[in-house]
């Protein structure tokens, strides 16, 4: 496979029913619980949504890594919501510099695609559009999100495996 600088792809096999996985990625409260964000409302296709980094409730070690960013804005533009199949949003990757206005920068597209398999649900996460990010931020944003999405795939697995977290 050719290494690309424009997109990140991560896959994880989740041992949970499709409806449960869908809820974990499409319900803003559940998503925020494992991802480490508190949103101001629900995910609605075509609508912007504001949030703030709060730290994951699933893994204390990852929560420690998120701690320096707690309270920072986490704003997205929800793109698509196709029940039990696809959820996508746009955001400004690695937009963590205090006082920096990222609104004029291009965004990347984050897509969660779900596919049922005999063993569970295959979640394929793709974030694309890094080649459009300003050069001075591009490599750092790509590297941070490459590692960040690896953590997030572990977090959603833990979230779904923990019966106490299930609503």
Where are these regions (language model features)?
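Extracellular beta-rich ligand/substrate-recognition surface
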Residues: 1-5, 26
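Lipid interaction determinants
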Residues: 6, 106-110, 122, 151-159
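Short amphipathic
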Residues: 7-14
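Short beta-edge strand/loop motif at the mouth of beta-sheet-based domains
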Residues: 9, 29-74, 167
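Hydrophobic-ligand binding "helix-grip"
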Residues: 40, 57-118
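Residue-level recognition of conserved beta-strand positions in structured domain cores
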Residues: 53, 91, 125-127
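A conserved amphipathic terminal alpha-helix motif
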Residues: 129-167
């Amino acid at each position: 496979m050719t290494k690309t600088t424009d997109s990140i792809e991560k896959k994880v096999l989740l041992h949970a029913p499709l409806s449960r996985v869908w809820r974990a990625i499409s319900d803003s409260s559940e998503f925020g619980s494992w991802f480490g964000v508190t949103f101001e409302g629900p995910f609605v296709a075509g609508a912007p949504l504001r949030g703030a980094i709060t730290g994951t409730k699933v893994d204390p070690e990852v929560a420690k890594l998120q701690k320096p960013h707690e309270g920072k804005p986490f704003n997205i533009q929800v793109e698509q919501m196709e029940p039990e199949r696809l959820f996508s949003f746009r955001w400004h990757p690695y937009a963590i510099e205090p006082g920096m206005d990222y609104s004029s920068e291009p965004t990347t597209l984050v897509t969660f695609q779900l596919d049922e398999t005999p063993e569970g649900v295959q979640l394929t996460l793709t974030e694309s559009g890094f080649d459009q990010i300003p050069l001075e931020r591009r490599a750092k944003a790509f590297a941070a999100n490459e590692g960040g999405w690896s953590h997030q795939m572990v977090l959603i697995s833990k979230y779904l495996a923990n019966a106490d977290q299930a609503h």
